Amino acid sequence: NKKEEIQLFRGSKYVQSKIGHTYQEAKKLLQTGCLVCFSGTPCQIAGLKNYLKKDYANLITVDLVCRGNPSPLLFRKYLEYQQIKYKNKVTGVKFRDKYYGYNYSTMTLDFEDERIQYHYGMEADLMLKFFFKGLCSKPACHQCVFKSIERVSDFTIFDCWNAKFYNKIMDKKFFPLLIQFCRLTSQLLYS
């Protein structure tokens, strides 16, 4: 609920998030009339809607174009490996850093020892390599029913890496693309 915490939502996160009690918390807020914006993978949005069992006018849902959901255990093991290799604690992760520019996915790790620099693409970084080759997603992700034009949410966001083909002004830069799916979202965007 704090404006300063908005930055925590930014950036790609190539690992399954922990839903925990968020569906219950969202329902409580919705029942009190609070405006709730719930974001997640399409299957998480579908899970929320299934849990709620009814539509709420004060609920805005945002999903993302998902290419799979790697295991948190695999990610923890990856971090442990990096900490052993560099003999230092990882303090931050950027899954799709723009360190080498907009057209190159880079894994950036921050360490307690700030002299350690880790900026590697999918050719060298194991987590990115496994992710982009589809080797670390759950089996259900490979037959996902939500990979379609029809979306379960009010908004869908994704990284539009081929924007240069659509807009000469963007040149070789990336921009997030937002697609709206209903009249409510149109009103929210333009009001």
Locations of the language-model features?
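Iron-sulfur-associated redox domains of electron-transfer enzymes in respiratory
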Residues: N1-S191
